[in-house]
Amino acid sequence: MAMKKLLIASLLFSSATVYGAEGFVVKDIHFEGLQRVAVGAALLSMPVRTGDTVNDEDISNTIRALFATGNFEDVRVLRDGNTLLVQVKERPTIASITFSGNKSVKDDMLKQNLEASGVRVGESLDRTTLSDIEKGLEDFYYSVGKYSASVKAVVTPLPRNRVDLKLVFQEGVSAKIQQINIVGNHAFSTEELISHFQLRDEVPWWNVVGDRKYQKQKLAGDLETLRSYYLDRGYARFNIDSTQVSLTPDKKGIYITVNITEGDQYKLSGVQVSGNLAGHSAEIEKLTKIEPGELYNGTKVTKMEDDIKKLLGRYGYAYPRVQSQPEINDADKTVKLRVNVDAGNRFYVRKIRFEGNDTSKDSVLRREMRQMEGAWLGSDLVDQGKERLNRLGFFETVDTDTQRVPGSPDQVDVVYKVKERNTGSFNFGIGYGTESGVSFQAGVQQDNWLGTGYSVGINGTKNDYQTYSELSVTNPYFTVDGVSLGGRIFYNDFQADDADLSDYTNKSYGTDVTLGFPINEYNTLRAGLGYVHNKLSNMQPQIAMDRYLESMGQSADTSSFAADDFTFNYGWTYNKLDRGYFPTDGSRVNLTGKVTIPGSDNEYYKVSLDTATYVPIDNDHKWVVLGRTRWGYGDGLGGKEMPFYENFYAGGSSTVRGFQSNTIGPKAVYKNGAHTSWDDNDDYEDCTQESGCKSDDAVGGNAMAVASLEFITPTPFISEKYANSVRTSFFWDMGTVWDTNWDPSSAPSDVPDYSDPGNIRMSAGIALQWMSPLGPLVFSYAQPFKKYDGDKAEQFQFNIGKTW
């Protein structure tokens, strides 16, 4: 080979080039060292071609271009006559990527970050990028207080210029805050100020929010909390002068010192509004009214700005700008607030689109909209659409996005982004109690049938005492105006004596149809007709049953009886919950009732009222107080009694947890000669007492009251991804059932007064709900702490497909 003349000294990573002051014509280009990169690809990345006249600048540009591809660790350009010889050393190819020792950061998150930096299997390894990644990961650990953490990239060579990449983590322990000092505070004590921080130097056992583990982001949030605390109390000149974070020599302890200047308290002297108010000055002025002498309050100023933006948003001004500038008068310690408003352009809606509704049809979502296409944009109407979609219960999350139309100064598209949840549920329930043993129930419910919004349910129960089946269908939009139509048919064969109720058998079947009429956004009225046939048999004489039979003109010794009833059913629902399942804010009231109409054998009425109110106690709605009540009352008409099988019952997972289902309230008092189970061992014996025999068999009552107070908390050990699917709560339940027609003189002296509503049962416990693929799962454990003779405890209860 002819002697090669070195043209240019090494450039970048000890690269060598040719030297040629006058340049030469390239007749050929040869490569040495290519393995994975094709010759054609390398040639395309070079600015030099065969036939070009090149000089030292062209050669330098060639080297830079080859390095820029990211495929090479070293590049040398040499001349052999008129041939350009390019010697390269390819970067190794990553064959595999593994992680070791990472506990705080998941593998998937690490892979995403590596891929974002171009580090992935099959790509070339850039050692410079790798060093940046090591430093970035260590900085992350430092930001969460793990100052002893280290991250090292271990590169293991493999044949064919490949490498295995392994990131080895030494996470260490989080540095704990030893002390937080605030210097310069005079108006408030350090303890008072720190009590509002997330970071603490001392955390009581009951404080589930406070944290001694240092995190840079939490400190920034706490400093902002400190600033807001002072600004909300009139300290308009408040300033955080400096913050020092000191680390102990072993890197396990943190000392934080915050130096502040409080300044004086200032009062608002007035608010002046200017700018483009879009003709809504009077409404904006109402939002800026202040009380004379009111202390300056930063949070109220921010709220005022937001209220002005919301007001303008209702009129189609989608992107208003509102800026408040306080003018501080140090002489008289007052602040004049100058508010500049720029309403901007007014927009109308070109299209409303939906994303994420893979099952639900667009029409099901679109009919819930209050914002119309082609109309001026109204932020309140867009929000109403979001609320209505949430209340459907079909979606885990609903978000809105107002997007400008490219090229248009006054058009936007409104996009509703939904995440669907499983609206079908397999209803399976199981309960266990010390006295009740095991009980089961099953059913299937689909609240969004084939994405149409129809609700279809098939429910059934089969056990020792009941065979029940029901088919129900509801069309929520029977008319375009939102009138709903629902109906059901059912069959029930109920052996009450095997269910720890008073002794009788009832075979019933029936049907009903109901129309629902929306009154406004939150109120719906319902009306319908129903028919039910009841055939009673095997009735053992007891006082409550005798009262009913006698009112129907039947003998007290009657053992069988049949009745056909037609009812007018009615109801009212007020629903202002923020979403259909796992609500966190708002309230719901449901009133239902029925009354028999002419042609019925029975004459009676029943009415029930259910209420639920959710009150969030934090901005993220993770801590929520829930109050619920259930009331019921019924009675006979025209001298007749309400049928005993229509009585109200309490106890169980849907009313008072910790008690066996339906066992709270009046118990059967059997008459002399009745053959029933009444003694303490549940042995079947004849009642031989002239005045009657008391029992533990529940008969229910014509009046009921149930209340519950529940504290909903974040579920421990559940990631943010599943936070909307799991709910934990601590509860206190109470309830009672009574019989307003009970006559104590008709029963033995040792029988309680069942007309007394003061016989209240109470329990407390913990519940866990999970929206599983099978439907909602509900676990509860409750301990009754106020009960009466004859009550049956059932501490643990488990249901699939049922919540209350």
From Swiss-Prot:
BP terms from Gene Ontology: Gram-negative-bacterium-type cell outer membrane assembly; protein insertion into membrane
Subcellular localization, as worded in the UniProt entry: Cell outer membrane
GO cellular component terms attached to this protein's record: Bam protein complex
Keywords: Cell outer membrane, Membrane, Repeat, Signal, Transmembrane, Transmembrane beta strand
UniProt keyword Heme, yes or no: no
Family as reported in the entry's similarity comment: Belongs to the BamA family.
Function: Part of the outer membrane protein assembly complex, which is involved in assembly and insertion of beta-barrel proteins into the outer membrane. Constitutes, with BamD, the core component of the assembly machinery.
Name of the featured protein: Outer membrane protein assembly factor BamA
Organism whose genome encodes this protein: Salmonella paratyphi B (strain ATCC BAA-1250 / SPB7)
